[in-house]
């Protein structure tokens, strides 16, 4: 079975995978696999975080540092403004998607999602704090894959952020980040 978020990039990624593998599989969409709205999180920063707001428009290094701080504030419910969803609502949304996927029994499942939900999955498997999800999210590579072993009662991380299909001497610039 294949589960994807409802974002256009999720469908595009699934289609590219299917084209490359010669597969033709139906996709089950689940909004629980969608990324958080990082633009809205920056916009929700209160006046006490004005300098941090500017990092949303900086170069990628400035943006990365700013996003990491914004995610930490979000996870602590300290943005200062109103976000589309709280950190806890985001985690609960992702967890509902994970529980739906876990009901697939012994089937192999492909999930196409985004960095935030992927990091939350890993955090849940590791039973780690919110700060771990943020740290994991910030190191995810584009087009990486993670592998989990799961059933209705257990959820275990087997590999994280793997890119053997990109980590080639002949393609030194193929590994990119968010």
Stretches found by the model and what they are:
Residues 1-68:
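Phosphate-coordination/substrate-recognition cap region in phosphate-metabolizing enzymes
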Residues 11, 24, 92-154:
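Active-site-adjacent alpha-helix immediately C-terminal to a catalytic or transition-state-stabilizing loop
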Residues 63-80:
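Short, basic/glycine-rich phosphate-binding loops at helix/coil junctions
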Residues 75-91:
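Surface-exposed cleft-lining segments at the edges of enzyme active sites
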């Amino acid at each position: 079975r294949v589960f994807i978020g409802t974002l256009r990039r999720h469908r595009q990624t699934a289609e590219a995978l299917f084209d490359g593998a010669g597969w033709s599989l139906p996709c089950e969409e689940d909004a629980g696999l969608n990324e958080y709205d990082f633009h809205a999180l920056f916009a929700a920063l209160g006046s006490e975080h004005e300098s941090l707001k500017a990092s949303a428009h900086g170069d990628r290094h400035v943006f990365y540092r700013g996003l990491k701080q914004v995610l930490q504030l979000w996870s602590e419910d300290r943005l200062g403004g109103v976000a589309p969803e709280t950190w806890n609502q985001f985690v609960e949304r992702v967890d509902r998607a994970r529980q739906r996927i876990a009901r697939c029994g012994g089937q192999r499942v492909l999930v196409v999602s985004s960095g935030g939900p992927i990091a939350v999955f890993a955090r849940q498997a590791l039973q780690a704090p919110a700060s771990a999800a943020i740290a994991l999210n910030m190191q995810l590579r584009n087009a990486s894959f993670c592998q989990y072993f799961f059933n209705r009662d257990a959820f275990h991380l087997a590999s994280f952020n793997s890119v053997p299909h990109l980590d080639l001497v002949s393609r030194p610039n193929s590994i990119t980040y968010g």
